[in-house]
A protein has these predicted regions:
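Extracellular/lumenal glycan-associated surfaces
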Residues: 39-60, 93-110
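Extended intrinsically disordered, low-complexity coil regions enriched in Ser, Thr, Gly, Ala
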Residues: 47-81, 110-125
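Short, flexible domain-boundary/linker segments around small modular repeats
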Residues: 4-39, 66-92, 133-140
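Amphipathic alpha-helical binding modules
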Residues: 90-144
């Protein structure tokens, strides 16, 4: 591994990786479109949940610091629709949840345009650590 190339790459804005960013946005927005149209599948939710976790991690790192309420409301909305979907097999949004998740998606897009590759790596580590430490709020509570 070339340490200098790694340092330079880590300072590169994610937005400079056009193909990656476009693919990510298409995947996220298609999942959101399916959710808003009442056609979301578990796979769509499996796309939106990591997106929301990533928004929260970047928020904690200072990207979108002014959007605390929007991040919290968006996470709550995703949790609620996910929980209902796990119970009845259909992922149907309520209007307030749709607004909250659209705002969360807009914040995610703005964060992706503002961060570097190194920031992305740090956010992934935060999400991974939260998962390993079981600090993430589960959609479905496990009963023992």
């Amino acid at each position: 591994m070339n340490p200098m190339a790694y340092v330079i790459e880590s300072m590169t804005p994610v937005a400079k990786h056009d193909n990656f960013l476009i693919d990510l946005k298409i995947k996220n927005h298609m999942a959101m479109t399916n959710l808003t149209q009442g056609k979301a599948t578990r796979e769509d939710m499996d796309t939106l949940i990591p997106m929301a976790n990533f928004v929260e991690a970047l928020y904690r790192m200072g990207f979108g610091r002014d959007y605390a309420t929007e991040v919290s409301t968006g996470l709550d909305a995703l949790h609620a629709v996910g929980k209902r979907g796990a119970e009845n097999g259909r992922f149907i949004l309520r209007s307030a949840e749709m607004r909250a998740l659209n705002t969360l998606m807009e914040l995610h897009d703005a964060q992706m345009d503002a961060i570097t590759v190194k920031d992305m790596e740090r956010a992934f580590k935060i999400v991974d650590e939260e998962y390993k430490q079981r600090r993430m709020r589960p959609i479905v509570e496990r009963t023992k």
